């Protein structure tokens, strides 16, 4: 009877010990599994790509990201960019060690201003290279050719709205290019610009409130008066009463 009770107690102890060992083994396996998962997670976060994001390399500054040619932004180019890429503008940018220049496919004086001059004026609103340089330099050089007044004056009704779009643009550099183009045009067409001047002066008046544009706009107005003759002063004063004539 005592033997039976003793063996029964031993069995209970062994069973309890077995359950404890099983629980200990399961707990150990669970800890090991968690440790393995944790190490995998740490490996993924310490990948070269992640490390590059957390600690950018010095070479990243020398190699900035470029526009993806298949991206959404590149699928819808501006009108000027599309014309330029198709060879619709007969000049190309030549990179120099000191400064850039344009290379014309044929002498500029042999080119028709319609619609080339208007297309170049539309390009003044571009904000990316090389379109910014090609448009402003092409516009300037085209107006320097022999016979430019006769070619440019008939285009004024179509040129003025395009120049106005540049002058009302929110980008300061676009505005500056538009302002310079307006002065260049006034040198060529002279008093013929007076009939269209009032459409452009409102935007100049608004920018005149900005200190950084006060001097270049004042200088531009003086040149408009100089090349526009006596009739230009009353037009300028009607839109910008604070303007002081160069004749004063």
Curated annotation (Swiss-Prot):
Q: Which Pfam families match?
A: ParcG
**What keywords are assigned to this protein?**
Acetylation, Phosphoprotein
Q: Is Cell membrane found in the keyword set?
A: no
> What domain of life is recorded for the organism?
Eukaryota
Q: Does the keyword Transmembrane helix apply?
A: no
Spans of biased composition, class Polar residues? 1-29
Sites where Phosphoserine occurs are at 47
Modification N-acetylmethionine occurs at: 1
Write out the ranges of the annotated region (Disordered).
1-71
Q: What is this protein called?
A: PACRG-like protein
Query: Which source organism does the UniProt entry give?
Result: Homo sapiens
Q: Which gene encodes it?
A: PACRGL
């Amino acid at each position: 009877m005592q033997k039976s009770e003793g063996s029964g107690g031993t069995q209970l102890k062994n069973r309890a010990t077995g359950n404890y060992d099983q629980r200990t083994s399961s707990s150990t396996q669970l800890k090991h599994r968690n440790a393995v998962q944790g190490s995998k997670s740490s490996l993924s976060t310490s990948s070269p790509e992640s490390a590059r994001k957390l600690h950018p390399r010095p070479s990243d500054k020398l190699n900035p990201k470029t526009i993806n040619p298949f991206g959404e932004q590149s699928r819808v180019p501006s009108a000027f960019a599309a014309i330029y890429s198709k060879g619709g503008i007969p000049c190309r940018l030549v990179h120099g060690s000191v400064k850039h220049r344009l290379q014309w496919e044929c002498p500029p004086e042999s080119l028709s201003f319609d619609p080339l001059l208007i297309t170049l004026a539309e390009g003044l609103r571009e904000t990316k290279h090389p379109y910014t340089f090609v448009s402003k330099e092409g516009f300037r050089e085209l107006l320097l050719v022999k016979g430019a007044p006769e070619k440019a004056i008939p285009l004024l009704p179509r040129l003025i709205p395009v120049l106005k779009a540049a002058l009302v643009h929110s980008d300061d550099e676009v505005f500056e290019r538009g302002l310079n183009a307006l002065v260049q045009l006034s040198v060529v067409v002279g008093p013929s610009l007076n009939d269209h001047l009032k459409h452009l002066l409102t935007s100049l008046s608004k920018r005149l409130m900005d200190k950084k544009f006060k001097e270049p706009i004042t200088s531009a107005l003086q040149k408009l008066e100089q090349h526009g003759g006596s009739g230009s002063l009353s037009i300028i004063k009607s839109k910008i009463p604070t303007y002081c004539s160069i004749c004063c």
